[in-house]
Curated annotation (Swiss-Prot):
PANTHER family noted in UniProt: ACTIN-FRAGMIN KINASE DDB_G0268748-RELATED, ACTIN-FRAGMIN KINASE DDB_G0279609-RELATED
Pfam families noted in UniProt: Act-Frag_cataly
Classification of source organism: Eukaryota, Amoebozoa, Evosea, Eumycetozoa, Dictyostelia
EC number of the protein: 2.7.11.-
Biased composition (Low complexity): 18-57
InterPro entries (UniProt xref): Actin-fragmin_kin_cat_dom, Kinase-like_dom_sf, PI3/4_kinase_cat_sf, Put_AFK
Keyword list, A-Z: Kinase, Serine/threonine-protein kinase, Transferase
Statement: the UniProt record of this protein carries the keyword Transferase: yes
Name of the protein this chain belongs to: Putative actin-fragmin kinase DDB_G0268748
Length: 436
């Protein structure tokens, strides 16, 4: 059996395959403070390109930022608070602000990042996200409606931050974001105003109180006019000349789900699937962003398997993974068992009918996403990212953050990655179909 590195170095791609697999800094991921309120420093990487070769990625430092452009928020200017349930326990608060107050506070920063070439980090630690920023003025988020943001908290929010960093490396369409922790004065200001503006809705007020018992919130960009997957007119949305491209992008999203233990879930699907199992973590748009994405990943939907490699469940999971990858790479135009299960589930539980023609595009997208994972991710990246994400929080009440990070089982992710690399190497002669 060849080693993982040998298999990586062995892979040679068809000349027709898109060459754009370079790594990217995650845009505006996590932060411990807002604006000038509390500039506590925390660990970060100096991002650099990973477009040379898969094996060279061990020398790459990926940026885990501590600030983002979503800062200096005037929480007193909240006009409404709404709870949005995306399914799979992904509940967000949609915060709407009075435009005149909050836009000025967000955009009128004394920011030098327009003239700064230091790999996406300006002197104020603003993050110039390659995926989301405006080319002419990188300090202002492209397509960002500054009058609204999303808030999310969970007991495993560190998993989300970890996944967002990996998604940023893979150049997925992640929103601008930052982390706000309980030790920050802004956390108190946010809490007070959220409770004030929800006092007339007892259910919402109770929910906010329960969320505020948690120590960390993610503040995320909200690009308006997006629809949830189950709200689409799917026949209309995926028709026309761009329908195939949209399905391929969904396939790339599935590829990351495969890597992070979502698509091949335990117990065997569809026993643990529900009405929001697939694509509950995305917003869909009629028009693409500047990088051509029609989707935005508002939640990682990640669920790491933390168990022994000697258990039956562990091996069953990897066997299902191998079967899926074998099917996709061996017969790219023939529907794999798990893609068929997904389509059947969407039709039965949500009344969503994805056409038979979608199969080829979805599986091409999965293969393209797998190519990117093989190129950009390795065990060093997984471990270094885990360590750096662990260290971005300086005050960790009851070790909540540390425990969440420690539950990320990198050996399992490496085993999954190993299977992906092996299957990709075995059937790379068929990778002509990955062309975007």
């Amino acid at each position: 059996m060849k080693t993982l590195r040998e298999l990586r170095n062995k892979i040679s791609f068809d000349k027709n395959i898109d060459s754009g697999s370079s790594s990217s800094n995650i845009g505006g991921s996590s932060s411990n403070s807002s604006g000038t309120t509390n500039k506590r420093s925390s660990g970060n990487f100096n991002g650099s390109s990973a477009s040379s070769s898969p094996s060279s990625s061990t020398n790459i430092d990926y940026n885990i930022p501590t600030f983002s452009n979503i800062q200096n928020i005037d929480w007193k200017s909240i006009s409404s608070v709404e709870k949005i349930d995306f399914g799979n326990s992904n509940i967000f608060l949609l915060i709407t602000f009075n435009n005149n107050n909050n836009i000025n506070n967000i955009n009128n920063l004394n920011c030098n990042c327009v003239n700064n070439n230091n790999n996406n980090i300006c002197n104020n630690n603003c993050i110039n996200n390659n995926n989301n920023t405006n080319d002419e003025n990188p300090s202002i988020i492209n397509n960002y409606n500054e009058s609204q943001i999303l808030l999310k908290s969970s007991s495993t929010i560190a998993h989300d931050v970890y996944a967002y960093v990996l998604e940023g490396i893979l150049k997925y369409p992640i929103p601008e974001m930052r982390l706000l922790d309980f030790s920050n004065l802004e956390y108190t200001e946010m809490s007070y105003n959220l409770l004030i503006h929800s006092k007339d809705d007892q259910s919402l007020n109770d929910f906010i109180k329960s969320e505020l018992e948690k120590s960390f919130f993610l503040i995320l960009e909200y690009r308006n006019n997006g629809k949830r997957f189950n709200e689409l007119n799917h026949k209309e949305y995926f028709s026309g000349s761009k329908g195939g491209k949209k399905f391929k992008q969904l396939g790339k999203i599935i590829a990351f789900d495969i890597f992070c233990n979502n698509f091949c879930k335990l117990p065997s699907p569809p026993l643990n699937w529900n009405s929001s199992t697939f694509f509950s973590n995305i917003l869909c748009y009629d028009s693409p962003d500047k990088n051509g994405w029609y989707f935005s990943l508002i939640n990682s939907n990640i669920s790491f398997l933390n168990t022994s490699p000697f258990t039956i469940g562990y091996r069953d999971h990897l066997n299902r993974l191998k079967l899926l990858l074998f099917s996709i790479f061996q017969n790219p135009s023939t529907e794999s068992v798990q893609i068929k299960l997904m389509r059947d589930h969407l039709l039965k539980c949500q009344g969503i009918k994805l056409s038979g023609s979608s199969v080829s595009y979805l599986q091409k997208g999965i293969a393209k996403g797998i190519k990117s994972i093989v190129n950009c991710i390795n065990f060093t990246v997984l471990e270094n990212t885990k360590e750096k994400v662990k260290n971005i929080v300086k005050l960790d009440n009851n070790n909540i953050w540390k425990k969440s990070i420690d539950s990320i089982y990198c050996p399992f992710l490496l085993d999954v990655l190993n299977e992906i690399v092996i299957e990709f190497a075995n059937y790379r002669e068929k990778t002509y179909f990955i062309k975007a």
